[in-house]
Amino acid sequence: MKPTRVPKNPCFSSGPCAKHPGYSVEELKDTPFGRSHRSKPGKEKLAEAIKRTRDMLGLPDDYFVGIVPASDTGAFEMCLWSMLGCRGVDVLVWESFSKGWATDITKQLKLKDTRVFEAEYGKLPDLKKVDFKNDVVFVWNGTTSGVKVPNADWIPDDREGVTLCDATSAIFAMDIPYHKLDVITFSWQKVLGGEGAHGMLILSPRAVQRLESYTPAWPLPKIFRLTKGGKLNKDIFAGSTINTPSMLANEDWLATLKWAESVGGLKQLIRRTNENLAVFEAFVAKNNWIHFLAETKEIRSSTSVCFKVDLSDEKLKELIKTLEKEKVAYDIGSYRDAPSGLRIWCGATVEKEDLECLCEWIEWAYNLVK
């Protein structure tokens, strides 16, 4: 029978993700429109975004946090280009974004001493094979495969290389031991549902030491430069961005952080995300025609949750179009490079009740098109 209730918010995209519950553009009214980002009010707003981010995440005091251009991609690329090349590199690949980092390292930077450990969608490479005398590049959560690393136990505290982690669809949703990571990057538009185009970069003391002791053989464009006179440019991490940010997007980020504080902070964001995943775990358990793409529970993402459905590609497209036409779910098809299926965002800005409602619609649409 066709469901009668619909999700309050039909936005289940894996990026940009749903705005937080109760979101209103009224929350942006204190944006310093028309003011320079270098002005006192501009700098104060950017510094506030950095401080609230640091406090929310509970980062170590000696880690640096900065706002950088070009989303998570910009944040991660600037570290690949600024820090790699002085020792071997191990890259872990199990979905399209991690594959992109491997391509940049091998085809663009052309680093010869690179080992790529690759697994197919739904699986993880063998983490035991990683050599931490090398620099290690990986994503915490594979946004396009719904597969995450189970923990950070495989990363030694006494590593020689630096660990570079793209954590964009994991941070604010999963328990991440920061001391295991030297570079952490993410974007505003993922777990907290901010706006696009801005990245955030977190550096450990070991990452800073690398930046200050190593100069790459290749030229670096202005928006990749993190040092000045051989020292870390600390201004970047105090709100003096490399280039002009959107003060409107920054205000939106502040609004997301204030919402996150209002629901109880990081622990509650993680709890909300896990409860959202549990909705689908129950749904998959009672329906034999839908399956998680991730092969085991311990590597199953709680944010970008990916599914295989026992339908032909054409029928699956019909199911997705039907749900969009009914205005109950937008942007839930799998990523273009991934196996055909569904990808549904379960981060903290999505309400559990909306996912429960969506499950009813998916079941109805499946029976309609099969």
UniProtKB/Swiss-Prot annotation:
> What EC number(s) has UniProt assigned to this enzyme?
2.6.1.52
Q: Does the keyword Transferase apply?
A: yes
Q: Which residues carry this modification: N6-(pyridoxal phosphate)lysine?
A: K190
What reaction does this catalyse? Answer: O-phospho-L-serine + 2-oxoglutarate = 3-phosphooxypyruvate + L-glutamate; 4-(phosphooxy)-L-threonine + 2-oxoglutarate = (R)-3-hydroxy-2-oxo-4-phosphooxybutanoate + L-glutamate
Task: Please state the pathway this protein functions in, per its UniProt record.
Answer: Amino-acid biosynthesis; L-serine biosynthesis; L-serine from 3-phospho-D-glycerate: step 2/3; Cofactor biosynthesis; pyridoxine 5'-phosphate biosynthesis; pyridoxine 5'-phosphate from D-erythrose 4-phosphate: step 3/5
Identify which top EC class this enzyme belongs to: transferase
Any one of the GO CC terms: cytoplasm
Q: Name one GO molecular function term.
A: pyridoxal phosphate binding
Q: Which GO terms describe its biological process?
A: L-serine biosynthetic process; pyridoxine biosynthetic process
The annotation note on the cofactor reads: Binds 1 pyridoxal phosphate per subunit.
Keyword annotations from UniProtKB, A to Z: Amino-acid biosynthesis, Aminotransferase, Cytoplasm, Pyridoxal phosphate, Pyridoxine biosynthesis, Serine biosynthesis, Transferase
Q: Where does pyridoxal 5'-phosphate bind?
A: W101, T143, D166, Q189, N243, T244
Q: Does the keyword Transferase apply?
A: yes
Localization terms from the record: Cytoplasm
* Cofactors that this protein relies on: pyridoxal 5'-phosphate
Annotated positions binding L-glutamate: R38
| SUBUNIT field | Homodimer.
Similarity section = Belongs to the class-V pyridoxal-phosphate-dependent aminotransferase family. SerC subfamily.
Question: Main role?
Answer: Catalyzes the reversible conversion of 3-phosphohydroxypyruvate to phosphoserine and of 3-hydroxy-2-oxo-4-phosphonooxybutanoate to phosphohydroxythreonine.
* Protein name (Swiss-Prot/TrEMBL): Phosphoserine aminotransferase
